[in-house]
Curated annotation (Swiss-Prot):
Subcellular location(s) of the protein: Endoplasmic reticulum membrane
Protein name as it appears in the record: GPI ethanolamine phosphate transferase 1
Membrane topology: Multi-pass membrane protein
GO aspect biological process, one term: GPI anchor biosynthetic process
């Protein structure tokens, strides 16, 4: 059986990894020829300001007094330059946002798993194409463009990462540091001939990354005074830097300025998803080569923003974020970034029709180059008779469009050139997408076939080893087995040869060959299949249909809960009424009334708001007091039942209660310290980490008696959970644990069925009891319900307090008791542990259910595995590659979550067994005893 689980884990890792090869492969290609506009550029230098985390509405709108928060930028919009909204794509994070701005392509999703701060995939950027680039700002952003540059012409100046502290007194210092360093730089340039020569060259870029607004947004929310004051500070800084440039270069009119943001921010201070507050960012540009403000009476945009911002009289020109890279390249005359998919927004250019036409033609050729390289790569890796080219853009069509465009330029039909080039770019981008997803259907079918085969084999294993289906007596010769084996070997060889001829990557061999041994294992069990068919034929058809409908409905409820959290509420309401429909409640009315009460109480949580809530310390404190009351109730109950606690175990229980009190104090103290902008107290940080470290050890010091050990696990994990809570979610594990304890009692009551031994008292059950394998019974239909309950409770633990499929459901304030300095991996790990704590509580309860129902954990686990795999197959087919970027990202994340859950179940099961069955001795004392 151990071999089966090891193979199962390996197979699920393959299925999990397949999504990265099918949907998460790098779209980048290499080997293109650089393309640049063959005319003198309007600017010699470009200054790029990126205000990290700045929302478009917060910058453009007027305050309560009717004044702008950024008067200099607003003056630019009205008197000097052009403006609009830059539309970002999901994920709205700093790295993909800057890659889109500076390199012109959207986040290479294959890089997500490889690194947060540096993009490990080689790509070209505006900085690489420039003669010199000087950049100032965050150490998280600048290095990835410097390391990706060829040569040493990209210079970076970063502050220490420790400055990125969400609990710091004043995050605007991050921005003033940048402005001060730029001023020092130009002071030094006046006295350094070598540097003076460099900054006076053409094709030079200055990049100012301003992180203060983002940091203040995370720490205080975008509606806060700190966030809005930071915008004013940035505006003042930009005004001063512009003045320095004009003074240094003698106001030569050869400097272009761009002010924008990498992403916005939600009202609750997070970003990453596709809410308009995250995807709508400001874009203001002025200076050399930029069109002056244009008064208009009507605009093409239907939204109400223009009236709210009182900018309806000034021409608004929206862009996609990747379009900014070709605009910057055009302004200073450098080659367009090789991997850019941005479309030059010619409406921003203040230049001749010829310059606009030539720039647009260059843009089209640059994107067409990528299409041609991608097509060549795919053609070379596919058998000629199997290759299907992109029909909308054949070689002859490419030549026709390019000749036509060049002819229009000679005839000075510049508007027609722009339209024709936009059409060519659209076709080339569609062609790029076509070749990028060329193998998707082929790989998808292979993975799906493997999935179905695995589920079939697992089902047959359950029927063979854990069911009462009668086995037929047949005598089979070895010949059919040999024939079957040789057939599958031949199939595998043919598949391998086919892949070898096409020079496919090694991962393709894994996805295409994996179904072969799986289906061989399925068809080898043809005797079990025959027994199953014969048994089903004797089973009442109406009962079979009813069971199938209930099972299908249950699976669909689980799947729908990923999209609609209220489906969990509906399920819990059904759970509450289940005992009353089956007459079970007449056996133990208090138990089943408790079951109904806690089911309905837990059903409230999925109806609560996912995010956007303000910190509510009173609810966290309330949860802490309830934990203390519960622990006192446990001690009292044990005393009433004459259960003696060993001195050491009583001490552990008291220390766990003290840990809960300390956690409450740390949460309260940290919250008020951050409000006063005094940062995270060191003692609070030490206590928090010590509590986290002890939470997995303390339960091992308690008694292994079922109720005592479960209470100890809850107390330990709740201390950590309180430290990671900011509001109502602190109550969630408490209510969930109460329901789990009642679930154990409910499952005991269901044992009063014919053929099942009488139940034991919970107080007499030990997690460490040596159960004879002969006592394990075979699976029955009720066990499928138990497995379904487990999966449902796991999903409730997952989505009960938020939709973690969306990255912006995370509130960074949750980790402020542990750290406030920006550290994505450490913060992510703490968030993950917060998510896993309810999981662990459910799995520990499931361990108890298995013991009380005398059921083999292997048999029940296999049923859970099948339910999870059916859900995973659902989401595999629901993955989208079209529609909004939010829909695409969400559909992929759902599949990843289910597959992760299936894989994690094995590890969580092991962790639950460790927490429930292992016992550490204190000073050589014996284990607790019952009286």
């Amino acid at each position: 059986m151990l071999l089966f689980f090891a193979l199962g884990l390996l197979i699920h890792f393959v299925f999990f990894a397949s999504i990265f090869d099918i949907y998460f492969t790098s779209p980048l290609v290499h080997g293109m020829t650089p393309q640049f506009t063959p005319l003198p550029p309007p600017a010699k230098r470009l200054v790029l300001f990126v205000a990290d985390g700045l929302r478009a509405d917060t910058l453009y709108e007027l305050d309560e007094d009717g004044n702008s928060r950024a008067p200099f930028i607003r003056n630019v919009i009205i008197h000097e330059g052009s403006w609009g909204v830059s539309h970002t794509r999901v994920p709205t994070e700093s790295r993909p946002g800057h890659v889109a701005l500076i390199a012109g392509f959207y986040e290479d999703v294959s890089a997500v798993a490889k690194g947060w701060k540096e993009n490990p995939v080689e790509f070209d950027s505006l900085f690489n194409e420039s003669k010199y680039t000087w950049s100032w700002g965050s150490p998280d952003i600048l290095p990835m463009f410097a390391k990706g540059a060829s040569g040493d012409h990209v210079y970076t100046y970063s502050y220490d990462a420790q400055r990125e502290d969400f609990g710091a007194h004043d995050a605007t210092k991050l921005d003033t540091w940048v402005f001060d360093k730029v001023k020092d730089f130009f002071d030094a340039a006046r006295n350094n001939q070598s540097l003076f020569t460099k900054v006076n060259e053409e094709k030079v870029v200055f990049f100012l990354h301003l992180l203060g607004i983002d940091t203040n947004g995370h720490a205080h929310r975008p509606s806060s005074r700190e966030y809005k004051d930071n915008i004013k500070k940035v505006d003042d800084g930009v005004k001063e830097i512009v003045s320095i440039f004009k003074h240094f270069y003698g106001d030569d009119g050869k400097t272009a300025f761009i002010f924008t943001s990498d992403h916005g921010m939600t009202d609750w201070g997070s970003h990453g998803a596709g809410h308009p507050s995250e995807t709508l960012t400001p874009f203001v540009t002025w200076g050399a080569g930029i069109k002056f403000p244009q008064n208009v009476s009507a605009q093409q945009y239907d939204d109400e923003f223009l009236k709210e911002w009182r900018l309806e009289n000034w021409k608004r020109r929206d862009v996609n974020q990747a379009d900014i890279a070709p605009l910057m390249a055009s302004l200073i005359g450098v080659p367009f970034p090789l991997n850019s998919v941005g479309i030059l927004p010619v409406g921003y250019l203040n230049n001749t029709g010829l310059f606009k036409a030539e720039s647009m033609f260059t843009n089209a050729v640059q994107i067409l180059e990528q299409f041609k390289v991608k097509m060549t790569q795919k053609k070379e890796a596919t058998l000629p008779f199997l290759f299907t080219p992109f029909k909308l853009l054949s070689d002859s069509q490419q030549l026709d469009i390019l000749r036509k465009a060049r002819s229009y330029i000679k005839q000075e039909k510049f508007d027609e050139v722009v339209s024709l080039c936009e059409e060519l770019i659209d076709l080339a981008l569609r062609g790029l997408s076509y070749y990028h997803t060329y193998d998707r259907l082929f790989l998808g079918i292979n993975v799906a076939v493997g999935f179905v085969g695995w589920m079939s084999y697992t089902s047959l294993l359950i029927i063979k080893s854990h069911s009462n289906i009668p086995k037929g007596t047949r005598k089979e010769g070895k010949k059919p087995h040999c024939l079957l084996l040789y057939s599958f070997i031949a199939t595998g060889v043919l598949v391998a040869c086919f892949l070898m001829i096409q020079a496919c990557p090694w991962t393709y061999y894994v996805y295409c060959l994996l179904p072969v041994p799986i289906w061989y294992a399925v068809l080898r069990e043809h005797e079990v299949i025959q027994d199953l068919v014969e048994s089903l034929l004797t089973f009442p058809r109406s009962h079979f249909v009813a069971y199938l409908l209930v099972f299908t409905l249950g699976i669909e409820v689980l799947v729908l809960s990923f999209f609609y959290r209220y489906m969990l509420t509906a399920g819990l309401i059904v759970f509450a009424g289940w005992p009353f429909l089956t007459q079970l409640w007449t056996r133990a009315k208090i138990t089943f009334l408790s079951w109904a009460f806690f089911s309905l109480l837990l059903a409230v949580f999925p109806l609560m708001p996912v995010v956007g809530r303000k910190p509510n310390l009173s609810l966290v404190m309330g949860a802490g007091f309830l934990v203390l009351l519960l622990s006192l109730a446990v001690v009292t109950t044990l005393g009433k039942r004459n259960i003696k606690l060993v001195k050491g175990e009583l001490l552990v229980l008291l220390l766990q209660m003290l840990s809960t009190v300390l956690s409450m104090y740390v949460v309260y103290s940290t919250h008020h310290s951050l409000l006063k902008k005094e940062g995270l107290p060191l003692m609070n940080q030490i206590v928090s980490w010590a509590t986290l470290a002890s939470s997995l050890v303390a339960p091992l010091l308690s008694s292994t008696a079922l109720s005592q050990r479960l209470a100890s696990i809850l107390l330990s994990l709740m201390s950590t959970y309180l430290l990671l809570s900011t509001g109502y979610e602190a109550l969630f594990p408490l209510v969930l644990s109460c329901l789990m304890f009642v679930w154990i009692q409910v499952e005991q009551e269901t044992l009063q069925q014919p053929g099942v031994s009488c139940k034991q008292k919970l107080t007499s059950i030990q997690f460490t009891c040596d159960t004879d394998i002969a006592q394990f019974r075979q699976l029955c239909p009720d066990d499928i319900r138990r497995a379904f309950f487990l999966v449902f409770f796991l999903l409730t633990a997952f989505f009960g307090t938020g939709n973690i499929a969306s990255i912006n459901s995370f509130d960074l304030a949750s980790v402020y008791c542990f750290l406030t300095v920006f550290s994505p991996f450490m913060m992510g790990a703490l968030m993950m542990w917060k998510i896993l704590i309810p999981f662990v509580l459910v799995m520990c309860a499931f361990e108890a259910v298995q013991i009380t129902t005398q059921l083999s954990s292997k048999g029940l686990f296999l049923v859970v595995l099948i339910i999870s795999d059916i859900m995973a197959l659902h989401f595999f087919f629901l993955v989208k590659d079209s529609g909004s970027w939010l829909d695409i990202g969400t559909s992929i994340s759902h599949y990843v979550i289910v597959m992760s859950m299936t894989i994690f179940l094995v590890f969580l099961n092991g962790l639950a067994q460790l927490l429930t069955t292992k016992k550490l001795q204190l000073c050589g004392k014996p284990k607790s005893h019952l009286m």
